[in-house]
């Protein structure tokens, strides 16, 4: 089987809209969570979010953007950055059947869908006032459809949607297609729009943080005793994933080699993780116990139950060996939902490159179950050779990815 490496990254997130901004935020432990006046005005319980502010979105012309929802726009910017970062010539990736794209979103595009529903309720003439571009804007494969068209991708092109594990599945699938010789290079990632319409759905579930509306920077509290739910966010990320010899032939910079990937299902509960699925996933990605892990970027979202179940799963996986250093970057960024998997892989790659571990911020009273679990609470300068990133989602879907410094 062929070896697979990562040669380019692009990101739009609550802590920065490019590699330089994100690196600075990670190292300094900067929170991207802010107060939301819009959420307050609607009377939502939660009034904080990891907002996305993207001026460069204006580079997309009206002709291009009319089919795009915000997740597609974020993804367009991330892909432009990833291409530039990987130093790929247009002549190579365009119209090349050996170059593909796999990118998805974990949630429905609620902003466009709800706007359409409201229009239908208010108007008898349903054909009037609805955008002719709405079908593409709201279809689950909207991101991959728009990007593959705009960037002239000829290889495999489709979307995966698996809740908060979406973009991690996209990365893993790209890895396997290249590993088995189906493609030589794949753009892989995902995007999620941040909107009031989407936030309302999670607010109704009482899944969002509500106790820190007056102090938004402290609202995302993974592993703190007083955590009370996740903070919603969004954004996009894109990786350039490439066969090793292809990367070497063009003298590309290699962030890391992908050496492990697994995907499992809990098969037990829609919203409460079993823990068993996570254990099986991490063990499969590690191929038993053959791959030691220096650092683990946890899924950790700040929910009362989910954080503990993942920690217990990690404890069992590493029961008789050295535990990896652990941090939860969602404590800074909030939860990017379908974009979180690729976001956290990018954060992990930056830590590998610059030899540090970003902190889990906002731990004022460490959860007792997290004691002796090597939770990093302050930026730590240390060389990392091998790292794992976990992404889990509603429906009991689990992904573990392992990368190694090349």
UniProtKB/Swiss-Prot annotation:
Compartments, as annotated in UniProt: Cytoplasm
Pathway: Lipid metabolism; fatty acid biosynthesis
UniProt KW keywords: Acyltransferase, Cytoplasm, Fatty acid biosynthesis, Fatty acid metabolism, Lipid biosynthesis, Lipid metabolism, Transferase
A GO cellular component entry from the record: cytosol
Record-given protein name: 3-oxoacyl-[acyl-carrier-protein] synthase 1
Family indicated by similarity: Belongs to the thiolase-like superfamily. Beta-ketoacyl-ACP synthases family.
InterPro entries, per database record: Beta-ketoacyl_synthase, Ketoacyl_synth_AS, Ketoacyl_synth_C, Ketoacyl_synth_N, PKS_Beta-ketoAc_synthase_dom, Thiolase-like
Job description of the protein: Involved in the type II fatty acid elongation cycle. Catalyzes the elongation of a wide range of acyl-ACP by the addition of two carbons from malonyl-ACP to an acyl acceptor. Can also use unsaturated fatty acids. Catalyzes a key reaction in unsaturated fatty acid (UFA) synthesis, the elongation of the cis-3-decenoyl-ACP produced by FabA.
Domain Ketosynthase family 3 (KS3) per the UniProt entry, residue ranges: 1-405
Subunit structure of this chain's protein: Homodimer.
Enzyme class: transferase
Entry's EC annotation: 2.3.1.41
Phylogenetic lineage: Bacteria, Pseudomonadati, Pseudomonadota, Gammaproteobacteria, Enterobacterales
Active site: 164, 299, 335
Keyword Acyltransferase tagged: yes
Stored Pfam families: ketoacyl-synt (PF00109), Ketoacyl-synt_C (PF02801)
Gene Ontology MF term list: 3-oxoacyl-[acyl-carrier-protein] synthase activity
């Amino acid at each position: 089987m062929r070896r697979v490496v990562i040669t380019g990254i692009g990101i739009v997130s609550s802590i920065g809209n490019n590699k330089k901004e994100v690196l600075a935020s990670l190292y300094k432990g900067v929170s991207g969570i802010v107060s939301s006046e819009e959420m307050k005005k609607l009377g939502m319980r939660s009034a904080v979010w990891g907002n996305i502010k993207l001026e460069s979105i204006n580079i997309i012309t009206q002709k291009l953007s009319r089919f795009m929802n915000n997740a597609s726009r974020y993804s367009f910017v991330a892909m432009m950055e990833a291409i530039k970062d990987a130093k790929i010539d247009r002549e190579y990736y365009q119209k090349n059947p050996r170059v593909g794209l796999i990118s998805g979103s974990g949630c429905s595009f609620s902003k466009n869908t709800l706007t359409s529903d409201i229009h239908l309720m208010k108007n008898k003439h349903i054909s009037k006032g609805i955008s002719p571009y709405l079908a593409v804007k709201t279809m689950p494969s909207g991101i991959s459809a728009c990007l593959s068209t705009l960037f002239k991708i000829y290889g495999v092109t489709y979307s995966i949607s698996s809740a908060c594990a979406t973009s991690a599945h996209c990365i893993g699938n790209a890895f396997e297609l290249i590993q088995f010789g189906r493609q030589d290079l794949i753009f892989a990632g995902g995007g999620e729009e941040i909107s009031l319409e989407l936030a309302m759905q999670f607010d109704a579930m009482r899944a969002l943080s509500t106790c820190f509306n007056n102090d938004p920077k402290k609202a995302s509290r993974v592993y703190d005793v007083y955590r009370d739910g996740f903070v919603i966010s969004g954004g996009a990320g894109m990786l350039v994933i490439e066969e090793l010899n292809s990367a070497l032939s063009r003298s590309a910079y290699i962030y890391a080699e992908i050496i492990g990937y697994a995907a499992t299902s809990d098969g037990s509960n829609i919203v409460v993780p079993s823990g068993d699925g996570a254990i099986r996933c991490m063990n499969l990605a590690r191929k038993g116990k053959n791959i030691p892990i220096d650092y683990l970027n946890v899924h950790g979202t700040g929910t009362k139950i989910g954080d503990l179940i993942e920690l217990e799963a990690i404890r069992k996986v590493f029961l008789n060996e050295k535990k990896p250093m652990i941090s939860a970057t969602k404590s800074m960024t909030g939860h990017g939902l379908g974009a979180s998997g690729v976001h956290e892989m990018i954060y992990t790659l930056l830590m590998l490159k610059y030899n540090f571990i970003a902190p889990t911020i906002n731990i004022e009273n460490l959860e007792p179950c997290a004691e002796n679990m090597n939770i990093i609470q302050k930026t730590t300068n240390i060389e990392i050779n091998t790292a794992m990133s976990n992404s889990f989602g509603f429906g009991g879907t689990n992904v573990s990815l392992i990368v190694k410094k090349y």
